[in-house]
Every structure is written in C-alpha cells, then in structure tokens.
Regions:
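Short, contiguous pre-domain boundary segments
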Residues: 1-11, 162
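Short, solvent-exposed coil/turn linker segments
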Residues: 8-9, 21, 34-35, 116, ...
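Short Pro/Gly-enriched beta-strand edge/turn motifs at strand-loop
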Residues: 28-40, 107-111, 240-245
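Rieske [2Fe-2S] iron-sulfur-binding domain
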Residues: 39-140, 146-154
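C-terminal catalytic domain of Rieske-type non-heme iron oxygenases
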Residues: 58-59, 64, 70, 128-129, ...
Length: 311
C-alpha cells in the first residue's frame, strides 16, 4: 500500500510560494467576476482586482458586457474605485474620458491630431458568459472553460443558473491561506464534527466525490425533514463543484451560491459568497437559507483559522 504525503506546511505561509502561485496558477486560470444580474442597466459596472490587476466589467447595452483593465492609458491611474453606474469613464487624475465601450473620447490637454486615439483605448480582457456568469482570463493559455461548463451543465440538468436571480454578495476576510480554505471545502470528512446542523440536513452516508479533468464534484442527498430548502423532497441533492483553482458552485433546491476565494497574502484570503434564488419573493425562505449558510460558513472560518495557527 502506498503512503500519502502532505506538502510542507511552509507552503501555507510563505510569501515566496504565493508569488509562484500567482505567476503559475492565478495568472493562467479563468476567474469568475460575478453575474450579469449585478449590472443590469446601461452604465452599471463592477470593479475587481484579479491577481493584482485592477479590472472593470461594465454594461454598455449596445455592445453588451465589456471587460477592461481599470487603468487610464495616459499615466496608469486606476479609473473607477467602487461599484456603480456612469455614463462615461473619466480619469480623476488628468481628466481623460472613455466611452462605455472603452474608446477614448477626450484627452484633456491634447488635440485629436496630437494623439492616435485608437491606440489609447482601454485595454480589453477576454471574457466568457455562461448562464449569466461572467468569467475572464488574463492570459491565453488557460484550460477549455466552455467544455468544463458544458460538462457541469449536463450534470445538473434540468437546473439552469440563469433561472436564479442575484440576491446579494457577502464578503469574508479570513485569517488563513487560500489553500487552507480550499482544502477544507474539498473534503466532507469534517462535516459530522464541525457542522452538526449541516450533518442533519444532508445524508452523510451518500456523500460522494467525483473527479473530472478541470473540476471536481461533491454531492449528497438531502434529508427533506430537516432541510432549510423549501423545494426539498426525497430525490433532492446538494451539489458542490470546484473549478480549479478558486471557483465554487454550491447548488441546493431553489438556491445557488457561487464562491470566489482570493489570496490577500500568504496567511489570509477574501471569500465572496454570491447568493441567487429562484423565487425572490419568498423572503422568509431566503432568510432561513442565508442564516443557515452563514452558520456553516462561520464554522468553517473558525476551523480554517485554527488550522492556519497550527501550521
């Protein structure tokens, strides 16, 4: 029998290791930004920092969803500082103005004949939209995301992400390495001890893990009698998908969560929970679901931070 070995604990606290991960993993992976539901109107935009790169995703209606580096082409100043809505993008440093499609509209202090405006448009980022979810990649040599998402789509059918409406985003700053959080998510062995309520909701004996080329799936049946999910019956399942390296889909009856895990430094990370529901009018069920989810998340935060201390 072969003996398994774990990686050295320093990989969970060494800034040099994180630098290697950013250069060789995060820079070469697809990233989830959010949903079209979060920017439904013309001029709505979200800002993100992905692998230390400032990014803006904006709805210009005419051309649809655009994704750019959130950087002025004049002197490199970050353009937009928080999510919002705007008719145009104006740099607060020297006043250069861009249209919502990224084209340079006005360069304060310069005449049009002085500059090649086409060369000074905002730098676009390749993106892919699947069931209203917006993904981007910073480099060309990433895995085949459309193929991966099609596989997931086939597994969860007839469930469709675009039948769920965005409700809100909850952010957590956690004092653990991003891999500690991922390691914890990727195993259900701790559930009976760390998550007593979740253990009553799921059928732990049915808990299974399946490995695919670019993602993994953990799934189990749900106990209808103890479930907080309104649409639960004896055939209901919970699905937990992991898309390498840091995208999670949590699917339960009537509810979808997407999670994004982003390293802050070698010993802390940000985790973003986006909540989606089929029935936005059933506020009582939504609140019950959110309260249950936050209880589970707080249990995970506690155990992950304890692990980080001990590494």
């Amino acid at each position: 029998m072969l003996r398994d070995k774990t990686i050295t604990s320093s990989w969970y606290s060494d800034e040099k290791i994180l630098k290697i991960e950013k250069e060789n993993i995060f820079s070469k992976s697809w990233h989830l930004l959010g949903s079209i539901d979060q920017i439904p109107n013309k001029g709505d935009y979200l800002i993100k920092t992905i692998n230390e790169q400032p990014i803006v995703v904006i709805n210009d209606i005419v051309g649809g969803i655009n994704v750019f580096y959130n950087v002025c082409q004049h002197r490199g100043c970050v353009l937009l500082e928080k999510d919002g809505n705007s008719k145009q993008i104006k740099c607060g440093y020297h006043g250069w103005v861009y249209e919502l499609n990224g084209k340079l509209k006005a360069a304060r202090g310069f005449d049009k004949e002085d500059l090649d405006f086409e060369e000074l448009n905002l730098k676009s980022i390749e993106h892919y939209i699947w069931m209203n979810q917006i993904f981007i990649k910073l480099q060309s040599d990433c895995n085949n995301l459309p193929k991966t998402l099609k596989e997931i789509e086939n597994i969860i059918s007839p469930i469709k992400f675009d039948n769920y409406l965005f409700h809100f985003r909850k952010s957590y700053k956690i004092k653990c390495n991003w891999k500690v959080y991922m390691d914890n998510y990727l195993e259900g062995f701790h559930i009976p001890l760390v998550h007593p309520k979740l253990n009553r909701v799921i059928d732990y004996k049915s808990y299974s893990t399946e490995i695919f080329d670019n993602f993994s799936l953990q799934w189990c049946h749900i106990n209808a009698e103890s479930s907080p999910y309104k649409k639960t019956d004896d055939t209901s399942k919970a699905y937990y998908f992991t898309l390498f390296p840091n995208i999670l889909f949590n699917i339960a009856p009537g509810r979808l969560q997407t999670n994004i895990i982003e390293p802050i430094n070698a010993s802390s990370c940000n985790v973003y929970f986006d909540y989606y529901f089929e029935n936005e009018e059933d506020l009582e069920s939504i609140q019950e679901d959110i309260s249950f989810s936050e209880e589970v998340q707080n249990e995970d935060i506690n155990i992950c931070e304890r692990i980080q201390i001990g590494l």
